[in-house]
Amino acid sequence: MMVYIMNAFDIKSTKMDVLSISLHTSDLFDLEDVLVKLGKKFQESGVVPFVLDVQEFDYPESLDLAALVSLFSRHGMQILGLKHSNERWAAVAMKYHLLFCLSHSENVKELGQVEVQKTEDGQKARKTVLITSPVRTGQQVYAEDGDLIVTGAVNQGAELIADGNMHIYAPMRGRALAGAKGDTSARIFIHSMQAELVSVAGIYRNFEQDLPDHLHKQPVQILLQDNRLVISAIGSE
């Protein structure tokens, strides 16, 4: 007799506190000296997760990333992802099965992030991160404290996260999570709706089957109403 287990798991939005290591040198011997002392602290606590901030390095070729990840791991420090303001590092992260976090820098406009503008009352407007390249399977892009605009296709298995709104002007086949820090007014706008999962402020919906024809592969907006996700065709009203 065959037994089928229904609802074996749920997919929910979550946040995990992870420390960041800002790397200042590519010299493995210098790092080893520091980690021999520092690593004892983490080895006593078990494996501790980190994101490796490589903002000080312009080109991926300047780092032996495999050796770096291995070095930190030997001292109880598990590297989960890379952080940089240039999108070229996303492919590097994927190569080594790491997450990618798009960070902010002073040169944000040419590196893919729109500058922070000020509103009429002098207050800072929300930051906007712009991604023009495709987001591939296994990659994650996070627009911290801001909105996210994506003009490249988002593949199945890729994940987009924004603390604010999200605009995707291309086929969306991955996961889209807006209002990640609890902003219930956040919205998601998708040019071609084919997403695996969407979420606003932690309220999510996954899609095991295609949506109705008037929504599937059509422009849609997604928002919260009465603590429920509402998906509607853009221009339908």
From Swiss-Prot:
Keyword set, alphabetical order: Cell cycle, Cell division, Septation
SUPFAM superfamilies named among the record's database cross-references: Cell-division inhibitor MinC, C-terminal domain
A GO biological-process term: regulation of cell septum assembly
Top-level taxon: Bacteria
Family to which the UniProt record says this protein belongs: Belongs to the MinC family.
Its biological purpose: Cell division inhibitor that blocks the formation of polar Z ring septums. Rapidly oscillates between the poles of the cell to destabilize FtsZ filaments that have formed before they mature into polar Z rings. Prevents FtsZ polymerization.
Subunit structure as annotated in this protein's UniProt entry: Interacts with MinD and FtsZ.
HAMAP family: MinC
Name listed for the protein in its UniProt record: Probable septum site-determining protein MinC
